[in-house]
Regions:
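Residue-level preference for the first positions of well-ordered beta-strands
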Residues: 19, 161-164
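A cross-domain feature marking catalytic cores of carbohydrate-active enzymes
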Residues: 23, 49-52, 73-75, 114-117, ...
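Alpha-helical scaffold elements lining the catalytic groove of polysaccharide deacetylases
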Residues: 79-108, 119-161, 174-178
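Hydrophobic alpha-helix-in-membranes signature
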Residues: 114-115, 130, 183
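Active-site beta->alpha N-cap acidic-glycine motif
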Residues: 1-97, 101-104, 109, 183-185, ...
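C-terminal domain-boundary segment and adjacent tail
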Residues: 2-6, 10-11, 41, 54-55, ...
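Ser/Thr/Gly/Pro-rich low-complexity, disordered linker/stalk segments of secreted
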Residues: 217-265
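Short low-complexity, flexible loop/linker segments enriched in glycine and/or proline
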Residues: 61-63, 87-89, 148-150, 207-213
Length: 265
């Protein structure tokens, strides 16, 4: 966590900037390769997993836990319709089935969730009872399907301390981008790569059953936490056309109760 100035001198007043890398839809055949790099660089990332993909890859999930990564829930089977169009019991069951499978695989349920397409209502979040995470940077890896293009898309975005990056560990080019280019470069630039919960804790944010998309200082200073889902037209491009371009408003959990566009994943 030490911070050094450009001249190499130690600055005790500063902390290393942090970014949370998140990976959806796994585990898959490339996840172990990603974990090799996680171990090599001694970093932590968050995996938002589909319950149906956990069975048969229990050892991979166990390794995630052993390496200090965060276990996230992305529903059982990524239903084709957005969660707001489903009844409440069905939505809760999507997450509960996945938690049950995760407990069988690694002895623990997910600590955080991400809704398919990023779409979920305040009532549904409350019923699931866990923090939900959006993202501030979409790699568009589902669309680009090229490691170099994925890397350029991410690095040309507004990355900064508190950013949350969306990727998918089910795509080989995405994992190649992360392992060969993105992770080495972010570490080289001085970023500490952490889980979403570690990022929240570092920013003194107590997570609630609400939706979060970043922990930028500007967001925190604007009073947008807890529950700020900041993917709007003037922030990150949050579309994931591999799944849907639909967007559904979710409550931001702030005192004014205003809604913000959730984007999609």
């Amino acid at each position: 966590d030490y911070y050094f100035n450009e001249d190499g001198s130690y600055d005790p007043t500063q902390k290393r900037p942090m970014i949370a890398l998140t990976f959806d839809d796994g585990p898959g055949e490339y996840t172990e390769t990603l974990l090799d790099t996680v171990e090599k660089y001694n970093i932590h990332v968050t995996f938002f997993m589909l319950g149906q993909n956990v069975e048969g890859r229990e050892s991979t999930v166990q390794r995630m836990v052993q390496l200090g990564c965060e276990i996230g829930n992305h529903t059982w089977d990524h239903p084709s319709q957005t969660l707001p169009n489903m009844d409440l019991d069905s939505v809760v069951q999507e997450f509960q089935k996945t938690d049950d499978e995760l407990v069988k695989a690694c002895g623990q349920a997910a600590t955080v969730c991400r809704a398919p397409y990023g779409a979920i209502t305040e009532e549904q979040m409350a019923a699931v009872g866990k923090p939900f995470f959006m993202w501030s940077t979409d790699s568009l890896d589902w669309k680009l399907m090229d490691a170099d293009a994925d890397y350029n898309e991410i690095m040309n975005s507004d990355l900064s301390d508190g950013s949350i990056i969306l990727m998918h560990d089910i795509h080989e080019p995405s994992v190649k981008c992360a392992t060969e280019k993105l992770i080495p470069e972010l570490v080289n630039e001085g970023y500490k790569l952490v889980t979403v919960s570690e990022l929240a804790a570092a920013k003194d944010v107590t997570l609630q059953s609400a939706s979060y998309s970043d922990f930028w200082d500007s967001s925190l200073q604007a009073g947008r936490v807890a529950g700020y889902a900041g993917n709007s037209s003037d922030s990150a491009d949050s579309s994931d056309g591999s799944e849907s371009s639909d967007s559904t408003d979710v409550s931001d959990g702030s005192s004014d109760g205003s809604d913000v566009s959730d984007g999609s994943d």
